[in-house]
Every structure is written in structure tokens, then in C-alpha cells.
Amino acid sequence: MALVSSLGFGTYLGECDDAEDARYTRAGAAALERGVNLIDTAINYRCQRSERAVGDAIRVAIASGTVTREEIVVCTKAGYIPLEKTPPATREDYRGFLDSEYFARGVMSAADVVAGGHCLTPRYLDDQIDRSRNNLGLETIDVYYLHNPEQQLDSVDRERFRTIMRDAFETLEKHVKRGAISSYGCATWNGFRVDMQAKNHLSLEELVTIAREVGGSKHRFKVVQLPINLAMTEAVRTPTQRLGSGTVTLLEAAQRLDISVVGSATLMQAQLTHSLPQQVKAAFPGYSTDARRAIAFAQSLPLTAALVGMKSSAHLEENLARPAIS
């Protein structure tokens, strides 16, 4: 896999329309040309439009001659059932969509779905991987995440959850062997940040153990993702992970288990782009904007990359700005 830029290009937010697609395509191509080579998306983002815009951006950047496919790290996710281009107008329309697109085709059953729209069964993952490859226009996806697997714990007990994850990891190892993905991981929201006694807690040590059981010592479970920012510091400060006989932070557990960490919500959906306290500004001198200070905080941590959503050249330039040296 290519050396990864410390800033990653995120594609979560935005309207489900052609204009937003075009903005993401332009910004993504520009980011690749400026050396931002990690792109993060998910099949459910913007009703599959984000994946397709990423594919367009990659093709534009490669055609310009400024980057090769081998220099790009593409990450996507599966778990939440993706819609097609626009959300259904009614609940009945959504049920009809599930029936025709998934249930009738045998991709999954209604019993496989939790929380109204989350699934991690092997047949469903088979389907989603090939859909994502088609959306992205790629033979191989570099990093394939299970999207918020802790969502399952709202509906199943811990024993059943382990079986779900084992089956999912076996499926992903199979797709590594066929060349559809290079590695896999878990992209989470709450799972790695909550207390160990919480119902939706995820144990990184347990996940690595499952990966070793199904994939051996050369398993391809390599990356986890979670929110890490100035306001959400659990990965750095809170010992949420049991490792051996002790408890450690997620970042320490990942380092000791040889798992890469990607930080999401770096700007907390623009909430950290303004009104930061004076002590934060003092801690990151030389930066002219709060957005850049928030990014600098994430980049100061032992992360593989910090993700930031970008849809304009102005935001790209701001996010890449180097600190002034006095």
C-alpha cells in the first residue's frame, strides 16, 4: 500500500444531487494532485453518489498524469443499506426498495437487518463489495471497513455479535484472496470510545483475536477508524480498551496490536472551525484559522491520517496550509 498523507479526503456530508457530485469530483481530483492520497467514503454516503464521485475524481487525476492508481489509498465501508441516488419519499417506498433490491434477490432477509437498515451478513457483504468496486471503477479497494459494527449490539447479545464479526471477517479474508480488497477494518462512531461496560463497546483485542482465528498470522485486519478531535479525545485520554491484564487507551492498544488508526470528524462537522479557546490557539501558533488548528491537533497524534470533508479549492488550500514561522 502507498505511503499515506496525514490529511485524508472525506466525503460524508452533502446533498444528493448532481451539483454536489461535481463539487466532490473537482475537489477530490485537486486533493489528489496536491498529494492528499487517502480518500475515505462509504457506499451509503449520499445514496452511493459519494463513491461514484470519488471514482470520477480518481479517473480525472490519473488522466491528468499527476498521480497513479498505485499512489492512491481508497477506503470505503459497508453496513448501512445504501439507497440509490435519492432517498425514498415514504417509508413504504423504502420497504419496496428493500424488497426489490435485496430481499427478492436473496442478498439478505428481513431478519438480517437491525436498526431499520444495518446488515453485516456474508452474502450482503459480497453484494456490497462488488457494488462499491463498480461505483468506484476499481478492481481492488485498498481498505474495506465494516461500518459501525457496534450498531448490531443494539439488537443482538455479545455472543451473537462475535459470530457475526467472525463470519464477516471470514468473508473479507475471502475477498482479499480474490483481489477485491487489500485489507479491512472497522470504522466506528461510539464503539471504541465508550466505557468497557457499555452495551455497544468494542474490544480491539477481541477483534484482532477473531481476525487471527479466521485469517491466521497474516490476516488483513489492519485499520480502525473513530472520531478523534479537540472535543472528542477518548482515543487519547480514556482507557477504554482491555489489553492483557491492564486497560489502555485505544491509541495505545492499536499501537501494541499493530493496527493503524484513522481519525474521523476532525472538524466535528465544522463545529471546530471557529470560536476555539485561546489556549488552543496558543498551543498551535503560526496557523491563521481555527480549522487549521483543529487539523493540526489531530495530525499531532499517532494517527495514520485525519479525515476532513472538502468540497472547494479554498477549503483544500486552507487545510493544507503550513504554519507561519516567526
Model-inferred region functions:
Residues 1-9, 114-125, 241-245:
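Short charge-dense sequence patches
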Residues 1-100, 107, 139, 156-159, ...:
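N-terminal binding-site loop/beta-alpha segment at the start of enzyme catalytic domains
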Residues 10, 33, 74, 104, ...:
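Generic signal for short, ordered secondary-structure residues
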Residues 22-23, 28-30, 47, 123, ...:
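Beta/alpha (TIM)-barrel catalytic core signal, keyed to glycine-rich beta->alpha loops juxtaposed to Asp/Glu
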Residues 39-41, 75, 140-146, 182-188:
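Short beta-strand segments at enzyme active-site cores
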Residues 68-72, 139-143, 183, 219-223:
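Short acidic capping loops at alpha-helix termini that bridge into adjacent secondary structure
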Residues 84-145, 151:
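Active-site gating/metal-coordination segments in enzymes
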